[in-house]
């Protein structure tokens, strides 16, 4: 057993014997001076740990955002154009199912089926974008389905605009009208929600990061909780909260700009 005197000496050295309020105020003061302390585990600077983790999470989320944007545009157009036939019903059902599937199940299934059984994409030893593609893809599936349905409904509303009526009078086909006239209007209405979802993706990436062993912010949080590494926990949660706030602010700004633009038109 560790001597009680030694324990008290360590508590005093780390400032853990002071009142919680004092510890919190000291932490805020250190934060203002960009000093988040050192890790209890390896004594590394917390800013360096969080900085490297933030890079990993940002790569996953940005790649996932690209996949969601491209996939949602394609799915949204197909859902609208095939809404009256069997293919449309199948796509609508598949979209609902995709939204309902948890990310951790997609990630474990991806490793089991795509990587192990089919041996199509390796989940280890990759470099560049391929290192983040499996995690980003699993994170993007639900978003593609969600925004695909949202875009489909927005396209349906946009198809009642006067510009669409004039395009039909000119004899243009429905697929061309959707891509040229309805889709831009639909995108405008979904951009703010898309930005908010990106903030949620940063917070929700912890599951796929741990499954694919990518040392992002979520991965660091789980490991720090296991090791009771308080400085790293505080810093990672702070950065995730800050990212959520930033994405929400960006969503509000974009929404106001788009409303101003539409009002000007």
What does each model-found stretch correspond to?
Residues 1-22, 114, 118-134:
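Hydrophobic alpha-helical transmembrane segments of membrane transport/permease proteins
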Residues 17-73:
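An internal, D/E-rich "acidic patch" concept
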Residues 5, 15, 19-27, 45, ...:
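Coil-to-alpha-helix initiation sites in intrinsically disordered, low-complexity, charged segments
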Residues 7, 25, 94, 251:
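Generic structural marker for isolated residues within well-ordered, non-membrane alpha-helices
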Residues 31-35, 117, 201, 214:
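A short secondary-structure junction motif
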């Amino acid at each position: 057993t560790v001597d009680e005197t030694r324990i008290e000496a360590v508590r005093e050295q780390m400032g853990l014997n002071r009142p919680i309020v004092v510890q919190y105020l000291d932490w805020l003061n250190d934060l203002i001076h960009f000093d988040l302390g050192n890790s209890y585990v390896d004594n590394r600077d917390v800013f360096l740990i969080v900085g490297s983790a933030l890079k990993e999470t940002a790569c996953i989320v940005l790649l996932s955002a690209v996949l969601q944007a491209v996939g949602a545009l394609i799915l949204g157009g197909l859902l609208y154009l095939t809404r009256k036939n069997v293919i449309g019903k199948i796509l609508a059902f598949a979209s609902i199912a995709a939204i309902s599937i948890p990310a951790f199940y997609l990630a474990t299934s991806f490793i089991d089926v795509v990587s192990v059984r089919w041996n199509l994409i390796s989940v280890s030893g990759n470099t560049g974008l391929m290192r983040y593609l499996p995690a980003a893809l699993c994170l993007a599936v639900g978003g593609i389905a969600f925004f695909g349905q949202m875009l489909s409904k927005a396209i349906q509303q946009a198809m009642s605009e006067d510009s669409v009526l004039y395009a039909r009078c000119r004899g243009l086909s429905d697929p061309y009208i959707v891509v040229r006239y309805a889709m831009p209007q639909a995108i405008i209405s979904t951009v703010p929600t898309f930005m908010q979802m990106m903030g949620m993706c940063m917070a929700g990436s912890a599951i796929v990061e741990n499954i694919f062993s990518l040392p992002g912010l979520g991965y660091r949080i789980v490991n720090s909780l296991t090791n009771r590494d308080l400085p790293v926990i505080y810093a990672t949660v702070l950065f995730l909260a800050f990212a959520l706030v930033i994405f929400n602010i960006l969503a509000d700004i974009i929404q106001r700009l788009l409303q101003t633009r539409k009002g000007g038109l």
